[in-house]
Amino acid sequence: MEDFVRQCFNPMIVELAEKAMKEYGEDPKIETNKFAAICTHLEVCFMYSDFHFIDERGDSIIVEVGDPNALLKHRFEIIEGRDRNMAWTVVNSICNTTGVEKPKFLPDLYDYKENRFVEIGVTRREIHIYYLEKANKIKSEKTHIHIFSFTGEEMATKADYTLDEESRARIKTRLFTIRQEMASRGLWDSFRQSERGEETIEERFEITGTMRRLADQSLPPNFSSLENFRAYVDGFEPNGCIEGKLSQMSKEVNARIEPFLKTTPRPLRLPEGPPCSQRSKFLLMDALKLSIEDPSHEGEGIPLYDAIKCMKTFFGWKEPNIVKPHEKGINPNYLLAWKQVLAELQDIENEEKIPKTKNMKKTSQLKWALGENMAPEKVDFEDCRDFSDLKQYNSDEPEQRSLASWIQSEFNKACELTDSSWIELDEIGEDVAPIEHIASMRRNYFTAEVSHCRATEYIMKGVYINTALLNASCAAMDDFQLIPMISKCRTKEGRRKTNLYGFIIKGRSHLRNDTDVVNFVSMEFSLTDPRLEPHKWEKYCVLEIGDMILRTAIGHVSRPMFLYVRTNGTSKIKMKWGMEMRRCLLQSLQQIESIIEAESSVKEKDMTKEFFENKSETWTIGESPKGVEEGSIGKVCRTLLAKSVFNSLYASPQLEGFSAESRKLLLIVQALRDNLEPGTFDLGGLYEAIEECLINDPWVLLNASWFNSFLTHALK
């Protein structure tokens, strides 16, 4: 790699990169990937500024090399590549002369035309994620961010790309060439995998002041200081009688340890009430896709272009009407919102050039659906001190709901195979350490089992929707932006396919804190008639919008097409986790690995191959009311993945509480099965803690019912 860098880059750039690395105590001969990355970044910064000048009138102009007009002023000041002291001197001098706010981190360039600092990024990873990391690190709206990737993608603050297309194309071509050159020498894979996220340095802190006093105050009785208590805990020998130890620790505790027998545990009490309703951010088994195969239209890859192309594949549109109203909403507004989407998509088509994004007109129906001007006015606490009767407003207890059969059907469907592949082989990420080829082999076997799984489709759909929504929330805060819900896959024959599930319209999104909410309206296609399970669709208004001709064994049948519309909301932190749903693949792969490891240690050899290729063997998947469920290893992989995906899709405080508390009971039951004669105290309190989490969440209720099945079979 070092030789390649010295051949590929201008000697001045190589020298600057070496200097920069030495300044941070790094060796270009050892950290060769970092050396290449620094050179690439420097070259992009220089290319960004090359040939760009400002003329006497203050306009930006491009002048190629060799032009005699030496009186022109450079448009960009290059900060990257200078030593730190010099760089900060330049930044300070710019801030003093222009009045621009001083940045927290050293930027790469200053743009005299736009009067702003510019941060240039070059990434080998997914461009959206890198952009968000940069934005989170800089935390300044004044510094303009512009990211390039080696795949020819780019992303910039508010989609303002600063330079003309030709200059940017030059940079993209150069990056592509570097990638090709590296690949031809077998260096690309290691370079691509070596990129780490943006790092911020955390300070180590001692416990002092108030925190120290709080720590001392919260010690158990009979302890004078934190050190004293730590020493006691470190030296605590847990043998002997537990009751005695407990009474030693505190006079108030008197615990009677009760033996835990097969007859001790009772089933969890599930709540009574109306059946629970669907609460995921997008439709799962009921979703319908409008798809195009081998997309090659102009602007392919731009979501709005793709969406319009997908919409054109369907010819059965009809005058929409409401078939299942939302109990509490103003249903005609949902109908008008869909009509508005259709009308505005039609308007786009009539324009000469289709725009890359579409902001909806702020009509009364959209303002209502997105809760515009509905938030209560915020008042500064200082202005309220004099009111004696200040109190938090009363909120009702959530209404209890009973388990409904649809959530088990949703889960079963998520474990099934589809006829498309949703991930490429390297989606789970390459091995970083050369830990033999076993890890790669396991990953490839696992990927083969889950790449066609419906849960994997949900992952890619979730990643896409959350990424698009978070980007729009940051880039178009005040706009009601129309966001197509899109996914991409490959057919059995390996043909690329782009799918449209429907649309989202985003509300105002001035998201300062992680938990600030952005409202959105989702409109999703479906063939499911909502009248079959109206309780599932309590939060939706459902329209009938067309008729679809389906091929079946008995010929062509016409089925009504529905649109599921609802108001929903999410936050920055939820979108961040949604963008990272691919982690579910990793989590379930690790669970499978631990099963293989256990098997391998018994047999004293690696069992990976036998594990995946012995199709006759069945494995325990779980326990249902019917008994212990068994299936192939592929089914185990897909079930574990579906569980992980549903934990992400249905994440909630109820799930957190249920998982943490039920685990304690699970461990006690496991100990009983292993003949370890467990003892418990306050088992009633544990049941109470578990059951207070069983309120109305469909996924938690299903897990609780599975838990009851497990108890029944475990204690036979």
From Swiss-Prot:
The keyword Acetylation does not apply. Signal peptide: none annotated. Mn(2+) 1 binds at residues 41, 108, 119-120. GO terms for biological process: cap snatching; DNA-templated transcription; symbiont-mediated suppression of host gene expression; symbiont-mediated suppression of host mRNA transcription via inhibition of RNA polymerase II activity; viral RNA genome replication; viral translational frameshifting. One of its GO terms (molecular function) is endonuclease activity. A motif (Nuclear localization signal 2 (NLS2)) lies at residues 184-247. Plays an essential role in viral RNA transcription and replication by forming the heterotrimeric polymerase complex together with PB1 and PB2 subunits. The complex transcribes viral mRNAs by using a unique mechanism called cap-snatching. It consists in the hijacking and cleavage of host capped pre-mRNAs. These short capped RNAs are then used as primers for viral mRNAs. The PB2 subunit is responsible for the binding of the 5' cap of cellular pre-mRNAs which are subsequently cleaved after 10-13 nucleotides by the PA subunit that carries the endonuclease activity. This is Polymerase acidic protein.
